[in-house]
From Swiss-Prot:
One of its GO terms (cellular component) is cytosolic [4Fe-4S] assembly targeting complex. This is Probable cytosolic iron-sulfur protein assembly protein 1. The gene is cia1. WD repeats lie at residues 22-64, 68-110, 144-183, 191-230, 235-300, 328-367, 402-446. Keywords: Repeat, WD repeat. HAMAP family: ciao1 (MF_03037). The keyword Repeat applies. One of its GO terms (biological process) is iron-sulfur cluster assembly. It comes from Emericella nidulans (strain FGSC A4 / ATCC 38163 / CBS 112.46 / NRRL 194 / M139) (Aspergillus nidulans). SMART domains: WD40. Pfam families: WD40. Belongs to the WD repeat CIA1 family. PROSITE patterns: WD_REPEATS_2, WD_REPEATS_REGION.
């Protein structure tokens, strides 16, 4: 049986430092900041019915997108795997989803992402024309939800867009990429019993997760042309405000003790079987990590062998709670972000606190032990052990009152692109978004 991670409440060991505000900010509540997948850009959505696009090179406003929605813009997401232009989806309290396009004329995409000499032009908003806003084209309006749109998310391929709403539904749209900005409705799922707060696509597969006011997380997959629920994850005792997936290649930090070996390979083996984990945050003030049980496999040791575990066939999945992270918030937690580069987790919420967590291997590696059929992992035969290395989670950095007295609505990781970065390594920044309209950028150092 897989060894559950330990939870360690420790003194912060990393330093979170304020780097810059994104300026000028909105004068109204700002909900979310979405980093561009390749360029040093972020998009922020606001109650003033606009999306502001900022440079991460000099933290200045590049353009303001407006005119497409009649009420607050609650959410936005960049389409991945697009060449030559940027495509942004926006979700609004007016119950619609907008698709915006803009040709990438800041310079060569690759050189901009690397932050070399061309980045100077990218960050120099003073060189821009007054009609910058007109360069964003309102391509299409997706209409279908009956109430406020709360979250939008593109699949890893960029072909599918998921949207969710206060109307308790999740819609999946396919971008036909026919040159006419046509989208087709692929599925409408209505199993949630409350306002659906968030959706997030698996980092590699066409698998969708959602969180809701009904306190559950649900997993969705397509089976023979029909989308349906394959898991309903229960454990939170309050609204699930945010979810995020672990990177498919994530490996915990090494143990601080010497003499620990083999854990990384064992981890990768288990990771390949169960796939990326899912993290969630809730009104119940907890951050929880969930892991999918691997599908049952047949024991093929001999011709007469039979499965050691009899499980129903079909698409249903079993998800288990991997760990509850150390308690760090005193009020509802609104957002959580799992770094694709380092595996660090960050959370923010109504208490104005920014918290960073780290997972490490521990030296007290549980030795493999034979187990009975009631305890065996579903992917293993009778008496076979599950040598999963032990890990522990700890709080490594905390900032209280990160935006003064204001609630923090969102947190995101992004690649650092300003001139103060270390050019010899790939650094990250944290971006927090708050009720007062401010967006702050933070660095994390050991």
């Amino acid at each position: 049986m897989m060894t559950a991670p330990n939870v360690v409440q420790s003194s912060p060991s990393l330093a979170l430092s304020f780097l810059s505000d994104l300026t000028p900010p909105s004068l109204e509540r700002t909900w979310l900041t979405a980093p561009h997948p390749t360029l040093p850009l972020v998009a922020t959505c606001s109650s003033d019915k606009t999306v502001r696009v900022y440079s991460l090179v000099n933290f200045r406003l590049l353009s303001t997108i407006s005119g497409g929605h009649k009420r607050s813009i609650r959410t936005c997401a960049w389409k991945p795997n697009v060449s030559g232009e940027s495509v942004l989806a926006t979700g609004s309290f007016d119950a619609t989803v907008g698709i915006w396009r803009r040709w990438d004329d800041y310079g060569e995409e690759e050189t901009l992402a690397q932050g070399n000499k061309n980045t100077k032009n990218f960050g120099a908003e003073e060189d821009r024309e007054e009609d910058e806003d007109d360069e964003w084209r309102f391509a299409v309006l997706l209409d279908g939800h009956d109430s406020e749109v709360k979250s939008v998310s593109w699949s890893a391929s960029g072909m599918l867009l998921a949207t969710c709403s206060r109307d308790k539904s999740i819609w999946i749209w396919e971008d036909l990429e026919d040159g006419d900005n046509n989208f087709e409705t692929v599925a409408v799922m209505q199993e949630h019993e409350g306002d659906v707060k968030c959706v997030a696509w698996h980092p590699a597969e066409e698998c969708l997760a959602s969180g809701s006011y009904d306190d559950t997380i649900r997993i969705w997959r397509e089976d023979i042309d029909d989308w349906g629920q394959v898991a309903c994850i229960k454990g939170h005792t309050g609204t699930v405000w945010g979810i995020d997936w672990e990177d498919a290649e994530n490996v915990p930090f090494p143990s601080t003790s010497n003499g620990v070996s083999g854990q990384e390979e064992e981890w990768k083996t288990w990771h390949a079987l169960s796939g990326p984990r899912l993290v969630s945050c809730s009104h119940d003030q907890s951050v929880r990590v969930w892991r999918r049980q691997p599908k049952a496999q047949l024991n093929t040791a001999g011709a007469s062998s039979i499965p050691s575990i009899i499980r129903p066939s079909g698409t249903d999945e079993t998800w288990e709670e991997d760990v509850v992270l150390p308690h760090a918030h005193e009020l509802p937690i609104y957002a959580v972000a799992w770094s694709r580069r380092t595996g660090l987790l960050a959370s923010v919420g109504a208490d104005g606190r920014l918290v960073v967590y780290e997972e490490r291997f521990v030296s007290s590696h549980t030795k493999p032990q034979a187990m009975n059929t009631d305890e065996v992992s579903p992917n293993l035969g009778e008496g076979v052990c599950a040598p999963h290395p032990s890990t522990e989670w700890s709080i490594v950095a905390v900032v209280n009152g990160a935006h003064g007295i204001y609630e923090i609505n969102h947190v995101a990781w992004a690649k650092r692109a300003d001139r103060g970065r270390d050019g010899n390594k790939e650094e990250e920044v944290l971006i927090t978004t708050a009720d007062d309209g401010s967006i702050k950028v933070w660095t994390l150092t050991r």
